[in-house]
From Swiss-Prot:
The keyword Chaperone applies. SUPFAM superfamilies: ATPase domain of HSP90 chaperone/DNA topoisomerase II/histidine kinase, HSP90 C-terminal domain, Ribosomal protein S5 domain 2-like. Molecular chaperone. Has ATPase activity. Residues 339-553 are annotated as: B. It comes from the Bacteria. GO terms for molecular function: ATP binding; ATP hydrolysis activity; ATP-dependent protein folding chaperone; unfolded protein binding. Transmembrane segments: none annotated. Residues 554-626 are annotated as: C. Homodimer. The keyword Phosphoprotein does not apply. It holds the Pfam family HATPase_c_3. InterPro entries: HATPase_C_sf (IPR036890), HSP90_C (IPR037196), Hsp90_fam (IPR001404), Hsp90_N (IPR020575), Ribosomal_Su5_D2-typ_SF (IPR020568). This is Chaperone protein HtpG.
Length: 626
């Protein structure tokens, strides 16, 4: 409907908005006071926007730079008004912001609400629909607003009961900014009480740097006055000794839209060539959109305590995108933009410093095993992006990565590289690892039979990112990494030390190798005997310079051309099946057995075959004729 600003107009909420309102009103009862948090947060954001826009257009202040948020409790009509003298809204803003929800995450939010009526309240803030929480406690909501710089007769009033329609009209409004009046339902009258308002503000908004004032009755003077009920000082500007643990946690919950406590945090003021303050938090739970690298993330940026922007991703690398917090710089210009940040030398230096600081915080956190297990479960996969992205800090990142390992005998990733190296065998030259589709496939792989027998530990990697990560983890503590599924002299050296009979077997079974090599000449790179196997007749490995099986799978999943891998076939001369095949004089049957053996190895290695039907037919033939 086209808006005619000269008269009151009634609009219908869009269907999606109706559904959201219904769900919020009927589902979010576990913590009704969240509406307070959201409305005060919106008011603070409006004042931040005014301060930012007034840098280039000071006339927006309208000769009034005394900024505040005010709460007015009216017990005569059971209404609660939260007002601010921030940027305000235009007529079009009211229609776009309060009449329809145009945010991309709304459908996902509704879907989540439908799935779980016990949805956590932090999702309200995450999805940007906090204003609508007003209807949890109200039977009617009235919004009066005027955009800074517009005439007094260009104010706007918005009214709704949240049941499907809303009214909009122009009004005269002397003060710029926005006031939201909630007409509370009977079971929410407690929010009119001074003690309840003060407790709620203290709980959620004490850290907000803008004064929050409450209309308070002076018994002596028999009059009302505006009493400030918050500290109105940015928490990061205060000395650490004056900030309680609870205040830090509440500040985190506000900026991160999270109801969970953070795992840890760091608060530092840096002086010298660059002057800045940081307050950074490590969450205890990942955000719903953390896995999308392209989604907005980053720190809140302030310059000389003036809010500049959210999601300033230039200050931390992508693999630390889970970090929440603020940076307040004294050196960046107040008119800084995202484009300027991209190439600003100061930002580059800040990013280096902040990255090292976060890695130090994570190292300290890793000393607390139980807390670090929580961190790794939530953010380990993201941190694994680090070795490829950040060569400068690769060693520090390596110290933070946790692995499952063969000798730990558990899927839980608790092994650090420091501990692995500390427990290496005396004659062990390298750090051994195996990559697989999952933990079960890895631990049952024939590649590990020798290591199990000799009690040599192997790191087990079963996340999709692992193969890619290991291309960048070349060595640690002067020990090179080595895949057990690749040809390697250090492994052969360990095997040879344990088995001096290898040459004898080669002499006794040379004919077997020649016949097998002739049969598989176009399919394999080489064939040889090995004593790495104890229970398995044969396995395949890749040449040291060949693409690994897991990397080939990654290429294939990404739709890229995968080069043909020619494997090395390793034969266990002690196995009964190998001895049986060696005794087979019928050349046709021998070839069938060798092809079966090779295809069996490919299936174990790749979990798939190019032609499974041919493999089944071969098995059937061998069963019938033997």
């Amino acid at each position: 409907m086209t808006a005619n600003k000269n008269q009151k107009k009634t609009y219908n909420f869009k269907s999606e908005t109706k559904e959201l309102l219904h769900l919020m009103i009927h589902s979010l009862y576990s913590n009704r006071e969240i509406f307070f948090r959201e409305l005060i947060s919106n008011a603070a954001d409006a004042i931040d926007k005014l301060k930012f826009n007034a840098i280039s257009a000071p006339e927006l202040y309208e000769n009034d730079t005394n900024l505040y948020i005010r709460i007015f409790s009216n017990k005569n009509n059971n209404s609660l008004t939260i007002s601010d003298n921030g940027i305000g809204m235009k007529y079009e803003d009211i229609i776009n912001n309060l009449g329809t929800i145009a945010k991309s995450g709304t459908k996902e939010f509704i879907k989540t609400l439908n799935k779980n009526n016990k949805i956590k309240n932090d999702l309200i803030g995450q999805f940007g629909v906090g204003f609508y929480s007003s209807f949890i406690v109200s039977e009617k909501v009235i919004v009066k607003t005027r955009f800074a710089g517009l005439k007094e007769n260009q104010g706007v009033i918005w009214t709704s009961d949240g049941k499907g329609t809303y009214e909009v009209n122009e009004i005269n409004k002397k003060e710029r900014g926005t006031e939201v009046t909630l007409y509370l339902t009977k079971d929410h009258y407690e929010f009119l009480e001074t003690w309840k308002i003060q407790n709620t503000v203290s709980k959620y908004s004490d850290h907000i740097s803008i004064p929050i004032e409450l209309n308070t009755y002076d018994e002596k003077e028999k009059t009302y006055f505006w009493k400030q009920i918050n500290q109105a000082e940015a928490i990061w500007t205060r000395p650490k000794s004056e900030i309680t643990e609870l205040q830090y946690k509440n500040f985190y919950k506000k900026i991160a839209n999270d109801t969970n406590d953070p795992l840890t945090w760091t608060h530092n003021k840096v002086e010298g060539n660059q002057e800045y303050t940081i307050l950074l938090f490590i969450p205890s739970k990942s955000a719903w959109d953390i896995w999308n690298r392209d989604n907005k993330h980053g720190l809140k940026l302030y310059v000389k305590r003036v809010y500049i922007m959210d999601d300033a991703e230039q200050f931390l690398p992508n693999y630390l995108r889970f970090v929440k917090g603020i940076i307040d710089s004294n050196d960046l210009p107040l008119n800084v933009s995202r484009e300027i940040l991209q190439d600003h030398k100061l930002v580059y230096n800040l990013k280096k410093s902040l990255t090292k600081k976060v890695l130090q915080v994570l190292h300290s956190l890793s000393q607390n095993v139980s807390k670090y297990e929580i961190f790794w479960k939530q953010f380990g996969l993201i941190l694994k992006e680090g070795p490829a992205e950040d060569s400068e800090n690769r060693t520090s990142i390596s110290n933070l990565i946790r692995f499952s390992s063969l000798l730990n005998n558990t899927q839980k990733p608790t092994m650090s590289l420091e501990n692995y190296v500390k427990n290496m065998k005396q004659n062990q030259e390298k750090i051994y690892f195996i990559t697989a589709d999952n933990y079960a496939s890895a631990v049952s792989s024939p590649h590990l039979e020798f290591f199990k027998k000799k009690n040599i530990d192997v790191l087990i990697l079963s996340d999709k990112i692992d193969e890619w990560m290991m291309n960048y983890l070349i060595e640690y503590n002067e020990k090179k990494f080595q895949s057990v599924s690749k040809d390697d002299k250090s492994i052969e050296k360990l095997v040879h030390e344990q088995n001096s009979q290898n040459e004898t077997y080669q002499e006794n079974m040379n004919d077997f190798l020649n016949r097998a090599k002739k049969t598989l000449s176009d399919k394999i790179k080489d064939i040889r005997f090995t004593h790495k196997l104890t229970n398995t007749p044969a396995m395949v490995i890749t040449d040291s310079n060949e693409m690994s099986t897991q990397m080939a799978k990654l290429f294939s999943a990404a739709g890229q051309t995968v080069p043909t891998i020619k494997y090395i076939l390793e034969i266990n001369p002690n196995h009964l099946l190998i001895k049986k095949i060696n005794n087979e004089k019928n050349e046709k049957k021998f070839k069938n057995w060798i092809n079966f053996l090779f295809e069996q190895c490919l299936l174990a290695e790749k979990n798939t075959l190019d032609n499974p039907n041919k493999f089944i037919a071969r098995i059937n033939d061998l069963l019938i004729n033997n």
